[in-house]
Amino acid sequence: MPMYADAGDVYCVYNFRLKQYTACQVTRVEEHGGKKAYATLLALDWQGNKPLGAAELADLKPLYKDFMYWERGLHMYKASAVVPTGYVRVGNTAPLVGEDTQRYASFWGDGYDVYRQLRWQQIPEKQRKAFKKAAKSKKTVMFAGREYGISKQNLSDVWDDFEDAMELKAFPCLSSLFLTKWHKNLYIVD
């Protein structure tokens, strides 16, 4: 017999990418034809080595999603009201938000966006702000003798030959790099 979520329910699930537990809250449940159909799920800004305890419910906060190109907003979506295997009910508390969403998902999620957001929050704030600013910028920079937008996301040394990997700092949004040869300072991290 399937277990259905109720508004206010808080669930924990093991996030295999984080190797920790994460949590979500059901903020509302919609019925269709007299049956629970959709649960609105809100990701919570919580992670731990063991499942959340009922005593911790009062301290929970929503997880805002703003990693990379996302504009800051609540990380929430609608999915089936049937609670999937692996999700453990911790308790029930008043929904943390009253907003609704028009985002739908085919399942409760595997925690990938939560993982990406929590990893994003580990990046120093100065770097995150530089990324966000560059992503929206029309500014250009000179690189390898050519002019490029500072928001450049990918680069290949096949088309843009350069000597020193430190030159890549010109592109705060660079997230894909294809190299065919060794470049000076490739392993320097700062």
Please annotate each region the language model reported.
Residues 2-15:
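Short coil-to-beta transition motif at edge beta-strands of beta-rich domains
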Residues 13-16, 29, 189:
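A generic structural motif
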Residues 19-20, 35:
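Short acidic/glycine-enriched loop/turn segments that link adjacent beta-strands
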Residues 20-30:
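Short beta-strand-centered aromatic/proline hotspots
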Residues 32-43:
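Short, solvent-exposed secondary-structure boundary/capping segments
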Residues 47-190:
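Intrinsically disordered, low-complexity, charged/polar segments
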